[in-house]
Amino acid sequence: MSLGQAGARFGPRVAGSRLDRPDPTRDGCRALSAAAVAFALVSGAGEAQVRVRTEEAPLTRSAAPGVAVLAPLSEVPVLEAPAIAASILAYSESSAEAAGDASAAGQPYRFADPFEVEATPATHGRWETTADGETAVWRLRAASAGSVSLNLGFTRYVMPPGGRLWVYTVRDGEVEEVVGPFTEADNETHGELWTPILDGAEVVIEAAVPAGRRGELDLRLGSVNRGFRDLPPEGIGSGSHASCHVDVACSDADQHRDQVRSVGLLQVSGTEFCTGVLLNNTSGVRIPLFATARHCLPLRAASIVVYWNYESAQCGDRGGGRLTDFQTGAYDRAEHRNTDFGLLELDDPPRTEHNVYLAGWRRDGALPTSAVGIHHPRAHVKSISFEDDPLSRSLRYGFTFEVADWDKGATARGSSGSPLFDQDKRVVGVLSGGRSACGNDESDYYGRLETAWTGGGTRATRLSDWLDPGGTGATTLGGRDWNGPPESAEPLYAVALRVQDGARSHDVSHAFRDLDG
């Protein structure tokens, strides 16, 4: 359900197991895409920077005579989140690494600080009705002085039929960057909606519903996440820190183009970045299973945003990537502490135009004779790293494969959870920790898929139930295009959700036959 742009550093978030806690609904969100839409055609103003598909502009920007006659934005109430504390702004990830953070390469990359709020259309903002009397419009501005970006967590989202929600920025009185509209189709069982990131220190929230359904809108803003680092982050585009990172746009990655498409930048709880990978399964049914590090998993899976295709336009740019291909929300599937493996299921299929790939995997225990890592170091554009020597097994950070010293490339914060591909281009692990960096000969450690396969012996602590749901016993599996022809007679995209309802539980099956719907 969202978009993005940001960057960051910070220490590791404490990773507790959500699977050990009551989780009455499971989490999820809907997928949207980005297409450049010239709102100038609607308003006569300059072209907006649009990062999601927007079939219509917010009513604030509509020029339809006699319809969207709304008060100027200057009259819309503002919810002021406090400026970010100086202690947070002063934090330096580079100094933490210099001080000997042994797991710097295996930690999330913090870019924002959350501020909890409790704002609803009944308590905040301003209601108006369009001149034709048909549409009720609620608007609220959210701001935090000094923030470089904002993203929002709606801890309650129920949109009535015909309703729409936008979040956008304004510059010089003009709507600039727009997310939405979100609609009734974005109502999920968990009842939440988390947005991607918009640049700047202020955003406008605008909901428009049929006038007769105003009372059916159930919206609660629960978190304003205040960005304190830009994306791309300063310092990685030049200098010694970035000197060894290899753009996937470069010819070095030509033999791994499919694998590159399987990797996404993972935004966690609106405050941190990691990396993850889409994995294939043996059923022949396309299911968006997304693996990352356990320590990257959020307390609420609804809060994740995955950005696809965040890459340099050409080799050597180390920037210029676009965050326009994204989707939000997921369900917890499995996690295993001893391998730091985490598995989510994205609650909507990736859009066709995102052109993603389901990576293959290997669990037969064979030691890779060489390896490739694909990742987003410090939430930067996608990079690729190469190890030409055989790997070894290690017990550091749990049951891991050790990359003793990358022959080309390195990792950093934000690379955490990224996949390790063996010589046959199959995933054998995800990044758990390490000291790897440009300019050193330190190791990285990847939680082993072979060990996480049986994990803790339960459905919630092992991968086998999800990657081999039919129990075929396969030890290796090739990858496949998400957009390829179906391999079974089942629906093109099928998900079985376990929904808890008090003391009762029941299975709900969702089938999505239209990937563009």
List each model region and its residues:
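Short, surface-exposed beta-strand/strand-loop-strand elements in extracellular ectodomains
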Residues: P160-G173
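C-terminal cap/linker of serine protease catalytic domains
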Residues: E311-L343, D347-Y357, R378, S436-E490
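Serine endopeptidase catalytic core focused on the charge-relay Asp
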Residues: I197-A404, D422
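Extended extracellular/luminal ectodomain segments enriched in beta-structured repeat modules
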Residues: S144-N151
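Bacterial N-terminal signal peptides
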Residues: S33-V42
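Beta-propeller-forming repeat regions
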Residues: A489-G517
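Catalytic nucleophile loop of clan PA
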Residues: V277-I287, G409-L431
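Protease-domain processing segments flanking chymotrypsin-fold serine proteases, especially trypsin-like
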Residues: A48-W138, A185-N280, R480-N483
